[in-house]
Amino acid sequence: MAEAGLPCISPMRLHKKLGRAVPYLRALVERMVTWPTEGAAERWGGYVFAAVDATVVCGPGAVGTDARIHTKLRIADVSLDEVQVTDEFGGETFRRFAWHPGELAVADRAYFTAAGIQHVLDASADVLVRYRLGSVDLSDADGDPIDVLVAVAHLAVGEMLDLDVVAKLPGGMAPGRLIAHRLPDEAVERARARLRQEKGAELSARVFESAKYVLLFTTAEHARLDADRCLRGYRLRWQIELQFKRWKSLCGFDMLPNQRDDTTLAWIYAKVLLGLLLDRMASIPTELSPPERHDAVGNLPSDVVRSLEAHDHRVAAPRRRTHVVRAA
């Protein structure tokens, strides 16, 4: 910094300044975000819509993966409630975060574990999470086990299922719902292609079959969130995840300044703000492109000229090029 003519700041002082900047950066991000109404509580049965996710990053001086950033994000205002930095082996679980009554924890299938769901329910919050085969035992009201693939096999393309189930958790049996949506054939083929690439020879027949569906588990009551709204809510989480992956590529999310949670929080807000600014600039192409070529005044329609002059905008006559003939 000193070489660039800027003040010389010690690492500790810079760390403290970043910590104090969090409220300011958060406020800037909240002002810049363009989807606040999408995550508003009134659209989701009064729930505070909170998405959790983890992303792999590199620490300073690293040549490979050596850290994960775990985030809890309020979708309504893109407020980061919690950020944790772990080594590359830090698992994805709801238990990393504190939960509060009225929150809806939304996450992908990595978070579908009995202990994680129990942690959220113990805080009087609810979950909306992608279902994963074999992770949590589900049964019907009579206690009979439910084979999820059998339960959804009758669905035609585009059809949905909203099935009351009971989940076996560490604290006992908890009521919930299985939400299923049969995907179009094109989407099924794309999902299966990703599974072949990710799992290779380890891909099981049941997982291959499950690619036909979007399968969700929720503890939210039907009166608050019906099946369609659950699917739309999960889709919103997925869209925001894609947006963050794009920002990660554009803004250098993959290089941590250090592995302190508080510094990383300010750093992430600054990166998100940069991503929002880039998106805002990209949405105004006329300001970034060369100015448009305007017609000469002499080519303007006479009624346009009269209108301009009537509002005290005197229009100068076009300059005429004169040719001077010099005597030989």
Question: What annotation goes with each model-predicted range?
Answer:
Residues 51-52, 106:
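Short hydrophobic beta-strand that contains or immediately precedes a catalytic carboxylate
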Residues 9, 13, 18, 29, ...:
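Single, function-defining residue in the core of a domain
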Residues 1-49, 55, 317-318:
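Gly/serine-rich nucleotide phosphate-binding loop at the start of the catalytic core
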